[in-house]
């Protein structure tokens, strides 16, 4: 997922630096080519399924009959029992502010107004410290090479899975696909992202029916407006005990304490172990 590259530092001395590998992958839904996206190349099945879910091309009740991945060709084919045809949809593209390929804003908004997030879900402020510690110290491509976005699916103060990619939209899609393929319920989950809180992040979190979105970065005004409209708890600038909630603050229990040790990630699929499993597919 990274390549050693030689160069020189500010003194002219030779250096070797791990640099993130970037490669195209083309996603097919049944017989139709849908999109080509630049990615780091891991979790191809989850990326494809998550992308189609977040573009409203796959439904929650769809039966996936097979997923084929050809690494040499850079192709992933998702096959479903239901026949699909998205020729008209592929003709209209309004790109979002996400990195790399981006997504079609209009397609993502198709079901947005109909989704109802769990009103009884809670977020404890005391979870932030153990979550942040676990996420910041987890084995990751970011720590070794940088130039990467990370997204984490959490349950309480326990991270469940951590996905990375050069575009944050890819990292989100991988988590959406992972949840679908592993039949993970979203109602009591927290979504943590290292990137800024944009409309794309809000829309995809709502589509996954996750009631709480957290970032150590800031907000856009449009994202806040959408979060309020959807009833999403939107927490930004989360560093240590400090955070700002601009939407859905009624879900928050303000019970600040030092919380856990951050060792919860030992039981989560770390990037290192996940990639070992990916290589064996």
Protein language model regions, located:
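Long, low-complexity, intrinsically disordered segments
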Residues: 266-281
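Compositionally biased, low-complexity repeat tracts
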Residues: 8, 232, 273-276
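Glycine-centered flexibility sites
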Residues: 50, 56, 146-150, 167, ...
